[in-house]
Swiss-Prot record:
Residues 275-302 have a biased composition (Basic and acidic residues). During the liver stage, proteolytically cleaved. The gene is ICP. Cysteine protease inhibitor. Required for the invasion of host erythrocytes by merozoites. In the mosquito vector, essential for the gliding motility of hemocoel sporozoites and, therefore, for salivary gland invasion and the subsequent transmission from the mosquito to the mammalian host. Required for the invasion of host hepatocytes. During the liver stage, may prevent host hepatocyte cell death likely by inhibiting host cysteine proteases. InterPro entries: Chagasin-like_sf (IPR036331), Prot_Inh_falstatin (IPR024321). GO terms for molecular function: cysteine-type endopeptidase inhibitor activity. This is Falstatin. A motif (BC loop) lies at residues 226-236.
Length: 354
């Protein structure tokens, strides 16, 4: 009941804020899950006024509570009605608000799978689309989950889908790409034993970027431990691997949840995923000297929020393994997929494999 009360209080606060700008009848909020989606869909189709929709997933990355694994997946559906162009002075057509019984709502969702195959194609954010990474003149490719765009004809879709991965303003031959012919033996699970460990935290409220230099031996495992804040909507994402220093522009960051990892004959990197701290985990004590004082102060784990919205306090881990000597720029960012320019914290790991 506390979770329901907390959620209702937050929704009321949002509605109060919106009422200063526009008629509060413009917006409606619903939690959609497996039990009530049909009822909400019927109400939407019965409506007479055009609307825009924003879908925000509940937190499925920041919680390690095993008891949540059996609960339904839910999303927050934000509906904004559009005023009629025929009568600018008229109000929004009433009678089509999406209403649902509070008993049908499930306020805590189960965790997203760490496997990319379990991410549904319809988890898209209504923001700008992305163009493709530029390709290297090599047999390596970065296999990133395709960004959704609307194309009128199926033929256009077939021609363009190959070029739709992630928008980038990087220069040509700057981005590594993963080939479909790469042997799966180079793929990592993210559960490998750490040879070195680096913690990335010290999150700022303003957009920033930082470059950290690391060296690895061929075959050595580097674990990147990523810390976040609870319930802020921010997520850690692996954005790309580059051979030249990339130019970072948060406006070009993906607006869709991505879980695909990168692997090639040269270097393999996993997407960040949550992990439980093991007392016998060697990464807790190895190479602690590479942490900054600010990062060491953030060792204590933040409290978990009562309602787990997108973004969580639990640590995420990404694993890096170099297979051949070389120099690579590995780009991670802590940002909101539905608002990439709002305080994105980008960390670039400059790795020398020797």
């Amino acid at each position: 009941m506390k979770s329901i009360t907390f959620f209702v209080f937050n929704i009321c606060s949002i509605l109060a804020l919106l009422s200063h700008c526009e008629d509060n009848d413009i917006y409606s909020f619903d939690i959609v899950n497996e039990t009530n989606w049909l009822k909400i869909a019927k109400n939407i189709f019965k409506g007479k006024s055009p609307s825009n929709f924003t879908i925000i997933p509940f937190n499925n990355t920041g919680s390690s509570n095993d008891n949540e694994s059996n609960k339904e997946e839910s999303v927050l559906l934000i509906r904004k009605k559009i005023k009629s162009n025929k009568n600018h002075d008229s109000s929004i057509i009433s009678g089509d608000t999406v209403n649902g019984d509070i008993s049908d709502l499930n306020y805590t969702a189960s965790n997203f799978s760490d496997n990319s195959e379990d991410i549904e194609d319809n988890q898209k954010y209504p923001t700008t689309s992305y163009n493709s990474f530029n390709h290297l003149n090599s047999n390596i490719a970065f296999n990133e989950e395709s960004e959704y765009i609307e194309i009128n004809s199926e033929s256009d879709l077939e021609n363009k889908i190959k070029d739709i991965n992630i928008k980038s303003n990087l220069e040509e031959n700057n981005t590594m790409n993963e080939s479909g012919k790469v042997d799966s033996k180079y793929e990592l699970t993210g559960d490998e034993k750490c040879g070195k460990s680096l913690k990335l935290g010290n999150i700022s409220n303003q957009t920033n970027q930082e470059t950290i230099t690391q060296s690895l031996s061929v075959g050595e495992i580097l674990c990147i431990d990523l810390e976040g804040n609870a319930g802020t909507g921010y997520l850690w994402v692996l954005l790309g691997i580059h051979k030249d220093e990339p130019i970072i522009n948060p406006e070009n960051f993906p607006t869709k949840l991505t879980k695909k990892s990168f692997f090639s004959e040269e270097i393999s990197v996993t997407q960040p995923k949550k992990y439980k701290i093991d007392e016998h985990d060697s990464s807790k004590n190895v190479n602690r000297e590479i942490e900054s004082p600010e990062q060491k102060e953030s060792d204590s784990k933040p409290k978990k929020p009562q309602m787990q919205l997108l973004g969580g306090p639990d640590r995420m881990r990404s694993v890096i393994k170099g297979h051949k000597p070389g120099k690579y720029y590995i780009v991670y960012s802590y940002y909101r997929p539905f608002s990439p320019t709002s305080g994105a914290n980008t960390k670039i790991i400059y790795v020398t494999v020797q």
